[in-house]
Curated annotation (Swiss-Prot):
Glycans are attached at residues 31, 63, 67, 97. Both disulfide bonds are absolutely critical for the interaction with MHC antigens. N-glycosylated; high-mannose. The chain crosses the membrane at residues 132-152. This is Early E3 18.5 kDa glycoprotein. The keyword Transmembrane helix applies. It comes from Human adenovirus B serotype 11 (strain BC34) (HAdV-11). Its main location: host cell. It is found in: Host endoplasmic reticulum membrane. A motif (Di-lysine motif) lies at residues 162-166. GO terms for molecular function: D-mannose binding. It comes from the Viruses. Residues 1-19 form the signal peptide. GO terms for biological process: symbiont-mediated suppression of host antigen processing and presentation of peptide antigen via MHC class I. Pfam families: Adeno_GP19K.
Length: 166
């Protein structure tokens, strides 16, 4: 009885330790994703996402600070670096200054948008996108209805065939 009790106590201690595991210990502050989109003809929208598994991540860019996700803008003259800081369980802070080529990515996003006539938004674009969206939604709905119809008819056929077999 005694060894079993000791074993149970040890297992409960190990379980409590794994439940208190801090994902911020393994978090890499340089592993962030950046998304770019044209905001105006000169300003570029930037979305920086870092570590959803770690709540104590702070992202700072151009005097804006936010947890895990920061939506900001970039224009010529704004710094091309952002800071990611992670607070450890002991209170220590790891800081990483990440430099990124905002100017090149924003130029590329603007070029692609203008290349395919997606920027600047116009009444014609909005109408075209709305029509395309409605047509795709109708097509997907029709496809779903056909699939459900085929599923029901084949099940009924298979059920009738099984009943007729001796």
């Amino acid at each position: 009885m005694g060894p079993i009790l000791v074993l149970l106590v040890l297992l409960s201690l190990l379980e409590a330790g794994s439940a208190n595991y801090d994902p911020c210990l393994d978090f890499d502050p340089e592993n962030c994703t950046l998304t770019f989109a044209p905001d105006t003809s000169r300003i570029c929208g930037v979305l920086i996402k870092c570590g959803w598994e770690c709540r104590s991540v702070e992202i700072t860019h151009n005097n804006k600070t936010w947890n895990n996700t920061l939506s900001t803008t970039w224009e010529p003259g704004v710094p091309q670096w952002y800071t990611v800081s992670v607070r450890g369980p002991d209170g220590s802070i790891r800081i990483s200054n990440n430099t990124f080529i905002f100017s090149k990515m924003c130029d590329l996003a603007m070029f692609m948008s203008k290349q395919y006539s997606l920027w600047p938004p116009s009444k014609d674009n909005i109408v075209t996108f709305s029509i395309a969206y409605c047509l795709c939604a109708c097509l997907l709905t029709a496809l779903l209805c056909v699939c459900i119809h085929l599923l029901v008819t084949t099940r009924i056929k298979n059920a009738n065939n099984k009943e007729k077999m001796p």
